[in-house]
């Protein structure tokens, strides 16, 4: 359980990173 929860947290961080990367590249282009 605990391990599964950690995996879910990692997925959340990965999803957030993927969502942030395009915005960061856009900021650099600006």
Swiss-Prot record:
Entry keyword Secreted: yes
A GO term from the CC aspect: extracellular region
Main location: secreted
Molecular function terms from GO: calcium channel regulator activity; toxin activity
Subcellular compartments: Secreted
Keyword flag Acyltransferase: no
Tissue: Expressed by the venom gland.
PTM per Swiss-Prot/TrEMBL: Contains 8 disulfide bonds.
Keyword terms, alphabetized: Calcium channel impairing toxin, Disulfide bond, Ion channel impairing toxin, Neurotoxin, Secreted, Toxin
Sequence similarity: Belongs to the CRISP family.
Main function: Blocks contraction of smooth muscle elicited by high potassium-induced depolarization, but does not block caffeine-stimulated contraction. May target voltage-gated calcium channels on smooth muscle.
Protein name: Cysteine-rich venom protein ascarin
